[in-house]
Amino acid sequence: VLFRSAMSPVIREQHDEYPMITDPKGRMIVGQFGSYVPEMLKMKNFDLEPGDVILQSDPFMCGGAISHINDWIILVPVFFQGGLVGFTSMFGHMMDVGGPVPGSMPTAATSIFGEGLRIPPIKLYEGGVLNQAALDLIMTNTRTPEMNYSDLMAILAGCRAGEKRIIELCERFGADTYADACDALLERTERAMRSLIV
């Protein structure tokens, strides 16, 4: 979904993005960049409801899952029959997020404050309603608003595709079976890693 929808070459051609699916505790079930969800939710206590979408780009508020503010993370809580069954998430590298130089990666920066716009975890959508003021503020602070907007919506579409598949699994097998399968997958992965290390 993301590669077919993204506009910038950073995502479309370089594939500088990573997806993730977690259980309700934020433990990564599928993914590549490590789960930042427990760390972020601990720092930012959101009341999550269906239709919410969280956006952030702050490396200090995601347990180091991203390394710089060009990486925008979308987090979508997945609900089934009123209960939280997990999260889908994806980050993608944005072409420009403001700051003193195009591309927002200044070699002379001595702190994160010299890089550009840092986004703390915010609700981009709340109950399915877009936070237009937040989106306007973010897009006003980039040199590439059209690309950033397109890529952001493509990332969200990718998360929504994951959300849809999780709900389909819960409808087919039940939420309890889905949760048990997630636990079994985590336990199997732990056993495999222990056997490699020991």
Positions of PLM-derived features:
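A short, hydrophobic, proline-anchored segment that marks a local hinge/packing element in signaling
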Residues: 71-81, 89
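Acidic side chains
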Residues: 16, 23, 52, 71, ...
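Short, solvent-exposed loop/edge-beta patches enriched in aromatic
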Residues: 24, 80-83
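Gly/Pro-rich turn-and-neighbor structural signature
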Residues: 6-62, 170-198
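Terminal presequence/propeptide segments associated with secretion/organelle targeting
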Residues: 1-15, 29, 33, 37-47, ...
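N-terminal leader/propeptide and maturation segments of large enzyme subunits in energy/redox metabolism
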Residues: 1, 115-194
